[in-house]
């Protein structure tokens, strides 16, 4: 049996790795029975032992395994292992270790031979101190740590004392530090720096590496902010040597010793060009580029049109043309010759089109530009699309036999001469030619209240400031020449008409739901400026221009098989979404809010449709015009269901039309039972014939603007004409009723009102300059007085005289006298009531108290318990005090001299004249 006894003293534990291995080998050699296995374990101890393992690690376990029979060695080694672990736990925070991870420990093991030179020197003990795990811990190290803590605490206390003393001295004397105090302050600062340096020596490598990286990054960032290139992996000293710049001399008295962060050159000292660096891809600004750039792969990004003074060569994208502002030379011919000139130059007729039975071709919608056509168009199959009214100077041919639709008149602009006689004599010429009264109308019927909108006027004018045009159901079988809806159109509802051209003027809020006919070919449709939205319209123009300030153009489902010549959506257009359309040319110009839901027909070819500037909305319209112009400032035109089989010449919705709602007629109507709907008043200077008998519809009066002559008397005389024409007093009114309180406004009265029962409702106080009549007898409501601003005269006397002005001083004394009680006579006094006598049976007998038994009676108080003599505490006698301990009851009074005593003052006697009388004598009053 091999017995190994090793005494682990602190000196033995303080040995380093080599000494520990040598001593173990010497102990093994001293053993009488050598063991090759034990020697092998000891020899391999140097390879297994490292500074990161514990003192009781794997080498000691090999020794324990080699000698399993020696239980004393096992117990001794385990006790030593526990004690060493405890000591390491205690001094772990003192030796600078930060508890690194296993990855760092493996790095230390692999580099243990190169890390021998990384030890630092302690400033107090001047010994090399390792910063790795497994430091030697001895008594000197414990003493050193204790001295360091004491030094640090003393430095803090001394610094606080010196600082407090210096601050107090400066606060009192108002001076700077003296030489002696400055020296004390510097000494305290030196102690603080020494303590910081000692802590820096204890920084482990993991934290030291992070600190070095931070210093390098800070130095590089400072150099980068100074205008020098950015080198993130070079230190400040390397940067200084590489760039060849010297740091400026320190200007302060106490400069920092480690100036790695201050070795930078200010930007004002850099006067030489910088060497090339890796950041050459950061080019100079475009202000310094005076030479053209070489060609690159991004040649599709062309120069802006302001600098384009020469025409572009032909390319595959010829349909994307150059803007007209920069186009100074004509474009070369291209394959898109179907993009013709605009209709401003279209003065020549179009060639004859294919017959209606022929199938539509792809080239039918590619019309010639109107700008290049300077001669009249030849006749075509679509002769129902008439030429504009400027060329029509002859009367129209006679019309068809009379029908129910003859109420629709011909517009006045188209008539330069009188119409020939026809069967439709009830369709009169416009009011400019009519100076005679209308013939009598037909007898009234039950259907006269519901007016028929199926009429065909020659001209319909819906004037200015009309906000919206909606639900316009036009007639399906008639052909109107012209319809004009004027400026600022607020609302046009419930109309059914079919026109040739329609013009919706500027500032129209929205144009939407325009379902046009699928088989007709309009010449032109213009929706003018300021059109915010065009929604839900179904039409197919040859050219559609939506002008400036249109917010959005969306949901335009145009036909997919047609080829437009050109579509331009101009500047400041917010959105064009979901558009399916095929115009010959469509221009949506600037600042148009929205054009949406325009489902145009896929088989028709209009010449042009223009939606001009700032048109807010045109919604729900179904029409197919030859030309439609929606003019300026029209808020909305919506729900225009036009007929699908007719061809109007023109429909004009003019500028700023305010409101036309539910109106049946703007032109001269034939005579009917509804004579309350009068003709326009501009040309009618003669009185109207007598109307039909009074009916329930007579309340609907004709506007006063249309009446140039007085109306005949009717049953509705309570609805009078405006006061501008009435300068005579009103006739006497009906007998007084409950409704007389509702008076006529004063501005409508040019004469005095007749007397009525409601005279208490007087006219305003400006007309009343006379005193009011005497009031009614006094009542409880007299306290509520009339306001003072309504009274121009004094009020009459009333019973409430106690609400008067303040009484005089003499009246106040009489009012404050107590009144004597009135003496009552013996006959007037009531005798006191006599008490009522009660019978014996009515008197309740008094209840006797119930007698209680002796057992029920509780004793008054328990008897006191008898105590023994030993239980009684003797009374304590008061302690007698000595005479010296007794304080005198009160100090003796100090004797004063006669001169110190002040004599008592006698009260001053007052004269009889100075004495005020106590109360005035009461004045004697008489009995009266």
Curated annotation (Swiss-Prot):
Cellular compartment(s): Membrane
Repeat as UniProt keyword: no
Record's compositionally biased regions (Basic and acidic residues): 406-416, 698-708, 740-750, 782-792
Keyword annotations from UniProtKB, A to Z: Membrane, Transmembrane, Transmembrane helix
Chain positions covered by the region annotation Disordered: 242-452, 663-928
Transmembrane region(s): 73-93
Pro residues compositional bias, start-end: 349-359
GO cellular component, one term: membrane
Membrane topology term: Single-pass membrane protein
Sequence ranges of Polar residues compositional bias: 252-263
Protein family per UniProt: Belongs to the NPIP family.
UniProt-recorded name of the protein: Nuclear pore complex-interacting protein family member B12
Gene that encodes the chain: NPIPB12
């Amino acid at each position: 049996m091999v017995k190994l006894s090793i005494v682990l003293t602190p000196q033995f534990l303080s040995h380093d790795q080599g000494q520990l291995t040598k001593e173990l080998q010497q102990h093994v050699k001293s053993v009488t029975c050598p063991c090759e296995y034990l020697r092998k374990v000891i020899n391999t101890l140097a390879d297994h032992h490292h500074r990161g393992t514990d003192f009781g690690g794997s080498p000691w376990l090999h020794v324990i395994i080699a000698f399993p029979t020696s239980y004393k060695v096992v117990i001794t080694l385990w006790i030593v292992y526990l004690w060493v672990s405890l000591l390491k736990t205690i001094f772990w925070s003192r030796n600078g270790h930060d508890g690194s991870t296993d990855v760092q420990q493996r790095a230390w093991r692999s580099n243990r031979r190169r890390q021998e030179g990384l030890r630092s020197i302690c400033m107090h003990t001047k010994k090399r101190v390792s910063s790795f795990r497994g430091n030697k811990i001895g008594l000197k190290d414990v003493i050193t740590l204790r001295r360091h803590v004491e030094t640090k605490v003393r430095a803090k206390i001394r610094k606080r004392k010196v600082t407090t003393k210096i601050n107090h001295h400066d606060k009192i004397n108002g001076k700077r530090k003296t030489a002696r105090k400055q020296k004390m302050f510097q000494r305290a600062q030196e102690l603080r720096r020494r303590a910081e340096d000692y802590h820096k020596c204890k920084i482990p490598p993991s934290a030291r590496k992070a600190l070095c990286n931070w210093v390098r990054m800070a130095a590089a960032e400072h150099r980068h902010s100074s205008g020098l290139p950015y080198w993130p992996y070079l230190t400040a000293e390397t940067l200084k040597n590489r760039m060849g710049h010297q740091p400026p001399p320190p200007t302060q008295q106490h400069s920092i010793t480690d100036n790695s962060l201050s070795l930078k050159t200010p930007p004002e000292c850099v006067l030489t060009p910088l060497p090339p660096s890796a950041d050459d891809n950061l080019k100079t600004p475009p202000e310094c580029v005076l030479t053209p750039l070489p060609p690159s792969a991004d040649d599709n990004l062309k120069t802006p049109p302001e600098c384009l003074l020469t025409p572009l060569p032909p390319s595959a994208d010829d349909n994307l043309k150059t803007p007209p502002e920069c186009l100074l030379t004509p474009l070369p011919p291209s394959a898109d010759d179907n993009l013709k000139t605009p209709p401003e130059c279209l003065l020549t007729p179009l060639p004859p089109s294919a017959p209606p039975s022929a199938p539509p071709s792809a080239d039918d919608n590619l019309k010639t530009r109107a700008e290049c056509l300077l001669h009249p168009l030849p006749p075509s199959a679509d002769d129902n699309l008439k030429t504009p009214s400027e060329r029509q100077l002859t009367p129209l041919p006679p019309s068809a036999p009379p029908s129910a639709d003859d109420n629709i008149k011909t517009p006045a602009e188209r008539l330069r001469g009188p119409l020939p006689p026809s069967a439709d004599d009830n369709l009169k010429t416009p009011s400019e030619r009519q100076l005679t009264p209308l013939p009598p109308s037909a007898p009234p019927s039950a259907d006269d209240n519901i007016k028929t909108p199926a009429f065909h006027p020659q001209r319909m004018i819906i004037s200015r400031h009309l906000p919206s045009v909606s639900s316009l159901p036009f007639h399906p079988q008639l052909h109107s020449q012209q319809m004009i809806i004027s400026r600022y159109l607020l609302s046009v509802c419930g109309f059914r008409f079919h026109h040739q051209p329609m013009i919706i003027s500027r500032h129209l809020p929205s144009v939407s739901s325009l379902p046009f006919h699928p088989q007709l070919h309009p010449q032109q449709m213009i929706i003018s400026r300021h059109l915010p939205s065009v929604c839900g319209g179904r039409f197919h123009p040859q050219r559609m221009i939506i002008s400036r300030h249109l917010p959005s153009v969306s949901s335009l489902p145009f036909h997919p098989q047609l080829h437009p010549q050109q579509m331009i959506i101009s500047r400041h257009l917010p959105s064009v979404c979901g558009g399916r359309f095929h115009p010959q040319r469509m221009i949506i110009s600037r600042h148009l809010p929205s054009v949406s839901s325009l489902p145009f027909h896929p088989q028709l070819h209009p010449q042009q449709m223009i939606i001009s500037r700032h048109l807010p909305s045109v919604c729900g319209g179904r029409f197919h015009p030859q030309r439609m112009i929606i003019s300026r400032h029209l808020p909305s035109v919506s729900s225009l269901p036009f007929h699908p089989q007719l061809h109007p010449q023109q429909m004009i919705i003019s500028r700023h039309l305010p409101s036309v709602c539910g109106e049946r007629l703007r032109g001269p109507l034939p005579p009917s039972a509804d004579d309350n709907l009068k003709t326009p008043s501009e040309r009618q200077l003669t009185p109207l014939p007598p109307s039909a008998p009074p009916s329930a519809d007579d309340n609907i009066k004709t506007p006063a603007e249309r009446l140039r002559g007085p109306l005949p008397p009717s049953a509705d005389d309570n609805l009078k004409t405006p006061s501008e024409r009435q300068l005579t007093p009103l006739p006497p009114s009906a007998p007084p009723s409950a409704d007389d309180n509702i008076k006529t406004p004063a501005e409508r009265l040019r004469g005095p009102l007749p007397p009525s029962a409601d005279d208490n409702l007087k006219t305003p106080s400006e007309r009343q300059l006379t005193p009011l009549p005497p009031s009614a007898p006094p009542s409880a409501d007299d306290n509520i007085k009339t306001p003072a601003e309504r009274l121009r005269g004094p009020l009459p006397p009333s019973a409430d005289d106690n609400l008067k002005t303040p009484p005089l001083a003499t009246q106040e004394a009489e009012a404050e006298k107590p009144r004597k009680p009135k003496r009552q006579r013996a006959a007037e006094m009531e005798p006191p009531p006599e008490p009522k006598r009660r019978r014996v049976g009515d008197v309740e007998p008094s209840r006797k108290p119930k007698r209680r038994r002796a057992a029920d009676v509780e004793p008054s108080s328990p008897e006191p318990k008898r105590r023994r003599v030993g239980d009684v505490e003797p009374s304590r006698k008061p302690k007698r005090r000595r005479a010296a301990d007794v304080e005198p009851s009160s100090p003796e009074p100090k004797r004063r001299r006669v001169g110190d005593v002040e004599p008592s003052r006698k009260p001053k006697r007052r004269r009889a004249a100075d004495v005020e009388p106590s109360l005035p004598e009461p004045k004697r009053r008489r009995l009266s």
